[in-house]
Amino acid sequence: MRLLVVVLAAVISGSVAAAPAGYFNLRPGVALESGDSWTDAGARYHLYGVQSCLRGTYYADSSGRREDCGEASLAVMAAFIADTKPVCSPIATIAKVTHVVCYATVGADQLDLGNLMITSGYAFAALQADGLPYSPAYAVAEQVAREKRAGLWQFKDVQHPAILLGRAAARSPTIQ
């Protein structure tokens, strides 16, 4: 009986890979808020330099059906989490949100999760207030996805979330 317990413990612990020091596992089952942010155990996280499509914004799919753009981003993020078991590292905490970079494992390769989201066409390079990307590499990845008409870019009416956020900011009154 004791041997069975030891064998079970070894099998169970062997199937869960621990994240390297300074990193944490992004596990399936976290509460996704969008295709770029989530909560886990009361803490909020955001994929640094990534802007998902906004929930409540829509595009017309190839059959003309109206689909929620943010839900599409969220679904792809959930699939990447489930399929690639990302490992993340915090890089900054701003306004109680921890911004992270994550890598996903695909076969023997470790790939940047933000880059995967953007090159798949289901997320965008996040822009600073001055219009410059937080990550120039992500801006290049976005341009490649757009040119290849990957993911959401295949639909003519998809708008970059930065455009929508900029319009919303311009309409909101300034507090002085």
Task: Tell me the role of every PLM-derived stretch.
Residues 1-7:
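Sec-dependent signal peptide recognition
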Residues 13-15:
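N-terminal signal peptide c-region/cleavage motif recognized by signal peptidases
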